[in-house]
Design a protein with these regions (language model features):
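A conserved structural/catalytic subdomain of Rossmann-like adenosyl-cofactor enzymes
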Residues: 29-332
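S-adenosyl-L-methionine
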Residues: 1-30
């Protein structure tokens, strides 16, 4: 139905043939330029023999239990998405946060995956990004066509504390927050022109030439003044005009609030990366080497190997300074 609504065509499988664990129904191994997926997390009771026979396991099959079942299918999905890529293919998918650091055969598979040099970016996502689940998750990105200078590196981004609160049970990334996360990746890849274009986009959206920090201050002060003005105006208005008066001020406050949100995101980005030079930011992003042999002499140099092949961003980026945490809470 979803494909029909969007005018798309495709081959839809059903029944046992549609079970990805036991069938490569579309014969995709090695064929895909891009893979995007949001698979079910932590699927259990997957038949080990049927799974092994279905292939697409370049790093081997997760260990089976005494019932000859795979107790957690997360690394089946991860293996499939990698296996589907062609020689320059790229993949991006959502995965349970536990998969970045799971042990046993999962760790062995993860080591083999990291050693390929094709893990590109790992991002931690906070709670409440799903409508039906409150648990955190991770975003995994593979790139078989990485630049040679990035081949033995992985960018880690911890975005658990970077979000917009929609309501009590739902968080999201705003349009500008998504652009900021993209900007970190652009700078890591040396795509400074894209970063500069985003700064121009911010300036055009705000329509001002003064610094982003100044704009945050000015708009914050303007908001305080207008709120007090609105409160007094509503109190002084005739009873029949109170709702109309409040609505007028609400509209003005909404417009200022929108600009303030944009200014805050612009300032958040510019404070960290200025005119466009990637750097590791404590508590936010860190570039790690895949193996010890590729580490530089820099005392801050770190490898995934020395972290026990963990792909958890928090293990690399560290903890943000207290003032940064307080600033984030204030902005929220």
């Amino acid at each position: 139905m979803n494909m029909a609504v969007h005018g798309l065509t495709g081959v839809i499988k059903s029944g046992d043939e549609a079970n990805s664990f036991y069938h490569d129904a579309h014969n995709l191994e090695g064929c895909c330029d891009y893979v995007m997926a949001n698979p079910p997390f932590n699927v259990d009771k997957v038949k080990a023999e049927s799974t092994a026979n279905a292939g697409r396991l370049p790093f081997g099959c997760p260990k089976e239990n005494k019932h000859k079942e795979i107790g957690n299918a997360n690394y089946l999905w991860i293996s499939y998405f990698y296996a589907y890529l062609n020689e320059n293919g790229r993949a991006g998918f959502v995965m349970a946060s536990s998969a970045t650091d799971s042990q046993g055969s999962d760790k062995d598979i993860r080591e083999k995956l990291v050693r390929t040099g094709h893990v590109d970016v790992m991002i931690s996502v906070g709670n409440n990004f799903f409508y039906t689940k409150s648990l955190p998750c991770s975003l995994w990105f593979f790139d078989k066509g990485k630049k040679e200078e990035l081949r033995n590196k992985v960018l880690f981004i911890d975005a658990k504390n970077y979000y917009t609160k929609v309501d009590r049970t739902l968080n999201e990334w705003s349009e500008w927050q998504l652009k900021n996360l993209n900007a970190i990746v652009w700078l890591y890849r040396g795509e400074k022109d894209k970063y500069e274009a985003l700064l121009r986009e911010y300036k055009e959206a705000l329509g001002r030439d003064n610094t982003f920090a100044d704009q945050v201050h000015e708009l914050s002060e303007k908001t305080k003044i207008l709120r007090n003005e609105a409160k007094n105006a509503v109190e002084l208005a005739d009873k029949k005009d109170k709702k109309k008066t409040q609505a007028k001020y609400d509209k003005q406050l909404s417009e200022i609030s929108e600009n303030l949100a944009i200014a805050k995101e612009a300032n958040w980005l510019y404070e960290k990366f200025g005119e466009g030079e990637y750097r590791d930011i404590l508590g936010l992003c860190k570039v790690a080497y895949t193996n010890d042999e590729f580490k530089t002499g820099d005392e801050d140099s770190i490898s995934i190997e020395e972290k026990g092949w963990s792909l958890t961003p928090g293990a690399y980026v560290g903890v943000a300074p207290v003032e940064e945490c307080q600033k984030f809470i204030k902005n929220c």
